[in-house]
Each structure stands twice: as structure tokens, then as C-alpha cells.
Design a protein with these regions (language model features):
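Conserved beta-strand -> loop -> alpha-helix junction used to position metal-binding or nucleic-acid-contacting
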Residues: 99-102, 109-153
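RNase H-like nuclease fold core
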Residues: 6-97, 102-107
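Accessory helical subdomains and C-terminal extensions of nucleic-acid helicases
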Residues: 145-170
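Non-catalytic alpha-helical coupling and interface elements of nucleotide-dependent molecular machines
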Residues: 9-13, 56, 113, 130-140, ...
């Protein structure tokens, strides 16, 4: 491992220092990554903030491309990364996708004033599913007086409610 690392590290550092990788980014995504790999007693960041290019190609498809990872999960970690980018990069960002973490929204408001902040699709679906489950549980409790049990109609339709329309049949 160490022999391989010594061989590729200079090239990785050269690529990481190349600012041209930020050219043409108009849609920027940010999300955290919790690092669980390896021995938990080892040093190093446990939470990382990842920035991803979500710009669509000429066919309208997104080919998500990792731009960078920085230690921490905070407004400061993201805002510092943004301020280290060129003004032209920040001015070119039209859409800033994020998870519901308020710190990322604050950094976008402070550093990407012209960008439209949106929740990423994963978190929109997750929040919608959670809201639907809460309503289903509340209706179950109000109508039957107990939590859902096997055989209860609202308990039995959980998977149906979570299924995508493309997976449903008549």
C-alpha cells in the first residue's frame, strides 16, 4: 500500500491543485459524508463536506463529478471552501443544491448570493416519505387507537405508499 501511495500521491496533489477542474460549473451540490471506515481510534476527520458538480450536459443529463472534500460539517467548512474559489467560479453558480442542514444554506446565502438554493432530490423524497409515514401513523392511531399491527390496512400499505409509480401495476 505505501509503495503505491508514494507513487500516486504526487499526481493526486497535482490534480487537486489544478483550478481548471472548477471551470464550467453552474450547478453545485453539497452534502456531508460520515467516514466510518477503518479503526475508530485512528486520527483524522470523521465528518467531511463534499462538493459535487451537478451541471447538466447538452442532453440535460447530470454526470455528478466530485470536486472536493473538506474536513468538517459546518457553515464555516463550506463557506471557507467557497471563498477559496475564484470570484468567477462563485458568480457562475446558478443553482446550489444542498441537504436540509441549515449551515450549508447560510454559507450559500453569504457566499453565493446570486445562486438559487434548492434541496437535493434525495432529501426531498426522504422528507416527503417521513411526512407521509407520520400522517399514516397518526391516522392509524386516531382510527384504531393503537399502533399499526400486521393485518391493519394502514400498516399493510406502507410499501405501496413508498413505491414509485413506475413500480406499480393494476
Amino acid at each position: 500500500w505505501w509503495t503505491l501511495w508514494r507513487a500516486i500521491k504526487p499526481e493526486l496533489e497535482r490534480l487537486a491543485a489544478d483550478e481548471t477542474r472548477f471551470a464550467g460549473v453552474t450547478s453545485l451540490g453539497v452534502d456531508e459524508h460520515i467516514w466510518h471506515h477503518g479503526d475508530p481510534r485512528r486520527k483524522g476527520p470523521r465528518e467531511l463536506t463534499g462538493m459535487v458538480d451537478l451541471t447538466r450536459d447538452e442532453d440535460g443529463r447530470v454526470h455528478a463529478r466530485l470536486l472536493d472534500l473538506v474536513p468538517g460539517r459546518s457553515k464555516k467548512a463550506y463557506a471557507d471552501w467557497l471563498t477559496q474559489r475564484a470570484e468567477a467560479f462563485r458568480a457562475g453558480i446558478q443553482i446550489a443544491a444542498r441537504d436540509p442542514f441549515r449551515g450549508y444554506k447560510s454559507a450559500i446565502d453569504d457566499e453565493l448570493a446570486e445562486a438559487t438554493a434548492v434541496l437535493d432530490a434525495f432529501h426531498v423524497v426522504k422528507l416527503g416519505t417521513q411526512a407521509m409515514d407520520e400522517v399514516r401513523r397518526r391516522v392509524q392511531q386516531d382510527t384504531t387507537g393503537h399502533r399499526g399491527r400486521n393485518g391493519d390496512p394502514l400498516y399493510g400499505i406502507q410499501r405501496l405508499l413508498r413505491a414509485g409509480a413506475e413500480n406499480l401495476t393494476d
